[in-house]
Amino acid sequence: MTTLHHDRDADGILTLTIDLPGQSMNVITPEFTADLAAAIDTIKTDAGIKGVVVTSGKASGFMAGADLKGMGALFGGGGSLKATFDQVWQLNALFRALETCGKPVAAAINGLALGGGLELALACHYRVCSDSPKIALGLPEILVGLFPGAGGTQRLPRLMGVQPALMYLTQGKSMSPQEALGFKVVHELASADQIVARAKAWVLANPKAVAPWDEKGFKFPGGAGALNPGFAQTFVGANALTAKATNHNMNAPIALLSAVYEGAQLPIDTALRVESKYFARVVADPQAGNMVRSLFVSKQAAEKGARRPAGIAPMPPKKIAMLGAGLMGAGVAMVAAQAGIDVVLLDRDMAAAEKGKAYTADRLAKKRTDPAKMEQVLGRIHPTADYADLAGCDLIIEP
C-alpha cells in the first residue's frame, strides 16, 4: 500500500497513517481509495485487530480532500447520470464501510482537515484533534461550485444540528479546533504529540463503538423533520439567503440544501445515497467543471507563474501607490502594508487620503490586531494629496 502505512501495536490497535508519496498534502486519489478499501477488508476479517486509529504522516496536515485536478472526467456529464452516481457513490460507500466495520475507529487529526479529509474523520467514531490554533477544519467545496459529497451534508448536521451546520456548509466556512470541540465535531483536543496516544486510549476503552446515528433512538441536535416548525423555518431562511447571494444561478447551493433537507428525514444509509444523487447531478453539469477550473486549477497555476515570460527575474515591489483612497484603494493599501510594502495613498485632498488610512486602522482594530503589529502596518501607509510623492514607486495602481 503506497498511500497508507500500517502499524499494529501489542494491544491490537492498527494505526493507518495516510502519507501520499510525492505530495505536500494528502488528497483523495484512486490509489488512496483502493488502499483504504483493502485496509477495511483487513480490519473486518482480522480478529487480531481490536480497533483502528487513522492519522496523517504529513506535517502539513491531515487531509485536504479530493484531488480536484483528477476529477476532470466526472465534470460535464460525459456519461449517463447513473454512471456518474455509481462513481461518486464509491467514496461515500467506502467511508460508510469504515464506519460500520465492527471495530472502534478513531481519527487523530494533526493538522488541516478539509473537504473529503474532514468527511473521512467524521466517518470515524471518535476524533482527537491537535489543539493548535493554526488548524482549520471545514467543508469548503461550495466555494468552487461543488458541495460535500462523501457524507458531509449528512454527518455534520447530525453532530452539530441542522441550523449551525448549514452556516458552515453553505458558506464553506472553516472552524478552529476549539470551535469544533464546542460543536462536538471533535471530541477531544490534545497536543500534537499526544493525539495518537489519546485516540488509542479511547479505542481500548470503547471496543463496541458505533456512530451516534446508528444507535436506536438517535435524534438530531435541535430536532429535524418536516413537521418541526424550527426545521422548516431554517430552510426558508437558508433558501432566501442562497437566492440573495446567487439569484439561484448556481447549482451547488440548491443541491446542498436539498440533500440536507431530505437526508435529515431519512436513515443514514438512505440519506447518504440522497447526497450522492444530488452530488452526481452537480458534477454532471458543466457549471461545476468550469468553476473548479477557474477558481481552483487555473488560480493555482497563475499563482505559480504558469504564464510568466521566461528569462525575466521577479521584481518584488518595495513601494507602491494607490490613486484613490476609497474602500478598494484603502483595502489594497492595507493588504500591501501587511505584506511589508510601503504604500503612498493619494487622493484629491489630505482629508480624503487620511480617511482611507483611518479605514485601515479601523479594520485592523476590529480584527484585534496586536498593537505593535498594527503600528507597523499603519506606518507603511503614507496618505497624501501631492502627486510628487509618487516618485520612487515601483508600481502605481488606479483601482
Task: Report the location of each language-model feature.
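Glycine- (often His-adjacent) and acidic-residue-rich active-site loop
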Residues: S56-A93, A113, L143-G145
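Glycine-rich beta-to-alpha active-site loop
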Residues: N92, R96-V144, P148, G324-V332
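Phosphate-binding active sites in nucleotide-utilizing proteins
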Residues: A313-E398
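Hydrophobic/aromatic residues within transmembrane alpha-helices
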Residues: V54, D67, L120-A121, A180, ...
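Hydrophobic, secondary-structure "cap" segments at the distal end of domains
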Residues: G152-Q163
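Conserved CoA-thioester-binding segment of acyl-CoA-metabolizing enzymes
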Residues: M1-T55, A93-R96
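Amphipathic alpha-helical segments at domain termini/boundaries
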Residues: M1-D19, L122, Q163, T170-Y278, ...
